[in-house]
Amino acid sequence: MTLWVVKLGTSLLRGDTAATIAGFAAGIAAAFARGDRVVLVSSGAVGLGCQRLQLPQRPETVVALQAAAATGQGQLMALYERALANHGIAVAQILVTRSDLADRRRYQNASGTLQQLLQWGVLPVVNENDAISPAELRFGDNDTLSALVAAAVGADQLILLTDVDRLYSADPRLVVDARPISDVHHPRELDALEAVAGDGGRWGRGGMTTKLAAARIATASGITVHLADGRDPRRLDALLQGERGGTVFHPHPEPLGNRRSWLAHALQPQGELTLDAGACDALHQRGSSLLMVGITAVKGVFGANQPVRLQGPDGRELGRGLCQLSSAAVQRALDAAPAAGPSPVVVHRDALVLHSR
């Protein structure tokens, strides 16, 4: 059995939404018939809400967008319910916020619920809870959400369906010699691609940056990621049967486990700790815990046992972890004279995850 997570972007659910969803449902049903299981992460609530409310244009304020999403989410689920019922498959709605997945207990509850639905042969349809998600804590067009869901359920494959045929070295609409990219094998390749995606232009602002971020999260968790054109719903059926297409992001050879993936990607850092070179070496080479003696600066305001970003002397992020001390306690220790005896542990190695070098 292969466990798939499939993400459908907003751009694919325009026009005749019912016919489009019916096309995707046929491919999903065929996968179920082969014994595979699928989790669907679907956008589209705002657009359907705008249609239902007969709004002349997409709202611009956060409150209006949230209200449109609340109206459209029921419409979206009704379409999936009807389409999958034709194949004898039940669907279940899962709405989450970023803060849900940042809380370890709620993260585990969401994972458990999804696993139970899959055991029952139900198709979970996951979406961000747009009606209540703060603007500053949004996932980013559900790309990040799909990667976090894939990690939470231990998926084998993540498919990101969009309105482009593959990843390119630059925006092919603007750069005539943009090079198509079929495979991405290493995080360093992602670094270079993210640098291009972030340098402006329609390619950088049009959603490719969030797809690269999603690929980084999923591949670090041992999941193969496919970025492919979903404008023809039959393409999903081919991908679910194992056909190659678009761009394939290959999984890291030493994937993070469930907890370490959660530490690295689901948490939102509340502050930063800057480390000296000796502490950086100790973390990378010896797998040590972070001691107070290795910290040179603290930034932000956070309480004990909250997530922080760890950075080296050059400002580059090394990893993330749960800080056992509050920011105030760390600052007091930095301001005080060095204490006699062993240096206290600030981030334990079991609550710490480092990025690949």
Curated annotation (Swiss-Prot):
One of its GO terms (cellular component) is cytosol. Keywords: Amino-acid biosynthesis, ATP-binding, Cytoplasm, Kinase, Nucleotide-binding, Proline biosynthesis, Transferase. GO terms for molecular function: ATP binding; glutamate 5-kinase activity; RNA binding. GO terms for biological process: L-proline biosynthetic process. Pfam families: AA_kinase, PUA. Residues 270-347 form the PUA domain. CDD domains: AAK_G5K_ProB, PUA_G5K. Its EC number is 2.7.2.11. Substrate binds at S43, D130, N142. Pathway: Amino-acid biosynthesis; L-proline biosynthesis; L-glutamate 5-semialdehyde from L-glutamate: step 1/2. PROSITE patterns: GLUTAMATE_5_KINASE, PUA. ATP binds at K7, T162, D163. It catalyses: L-glutamate + ATP = L-glutamyl 5-phosphate + ADP. InterPro entries: AceGlu_kinase-like_sf, Asp/Glu/Uridylate_kinase, G5K_ProB, Glu/AcGlu_kinase, Glu_5kinase, Glu_5kinase/COase_Synthase, Glutamate_5-kinase_CS, PUA. Catalyzes the transfer of a phosphate group to glutamate to form L-glutamate 5-phosphate. Belongs to the glutamate 5-kinase family. This is Glutamate 5-kinase. The lineage of its organism: Bacteria, Bacillati, Cyanobacteriota, Cyanophyceae, Synechococcales. The gene is proB.
